[in-house]
Amino acid sequence: KNSNRLYPCFETEEELALKKKSLLSSGKPPIYDRSSFNLSKDEIDKKISSGLKPHWRFKLDEKIITWNDLIKGKVSFDTKNLSDPVLIREDGSLLYHLPSVIDDIQENISHIIRGEDHISNTAYHIQIFEAFGSTIPEFAHHPFLTDDQGKGFSKRLGSLSIDSFKNEGFENIALLNYLLFIGSSKNIEPIKNLKDIIDKFEIKSISNSSAKFSKE
């Protein structure tokens, strides 16, 4: 906040939706226009005094954010194509970005491995790490496992779960064996203990494309 990276915004959800609709109808990307960033201290104080509660956005530095993803390879985002992310809601609750980065810093996390749906979040997180003056971890974004029709598994849709395998009598070591090799170019081979599975795991062997899984 003291470095002018965190700033209050007063637009309602309806106002933001109208801005987004207007930009899209004009053929422009729905990027937040930073109108609240330009408010003076007096203007901010008046809005708060009138009862308006701000949400808080993180101002992105205008540059190309690049990292060497351990699965995807070189990934780049131009911040001019990204909206400043909201970090704190009107009620004071935190969105995912800020506590995620703070937790990684406090726990000295060296590698962050997560689904490819978080790739754009990583662009935000790298700048938040930089704002804190912290070391940026290594990142790896894995593709999602799909069924034999190419559809993603979903807990909401009652898809497969670890418990379902357990209830059907599958041994955990068998499932770990399968997960070690699926989506890689390696042939599946039986490994009987967890240490050997860990020793054989290589993140660079994970395919950049979604692997298909059939229970049959």
Residue ranges and their predicted role:
Residues S120, F132-E216:
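Catalytic adenosine-cofactor/nucleotide-binding cores of aminoacyl-tRNA synthetases and other
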Residues N2-H141, T146-K155, S161-I162, K186:
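Active-site cores that bind ATP or allylic diphosphates and position pyrophosphate for catalysis
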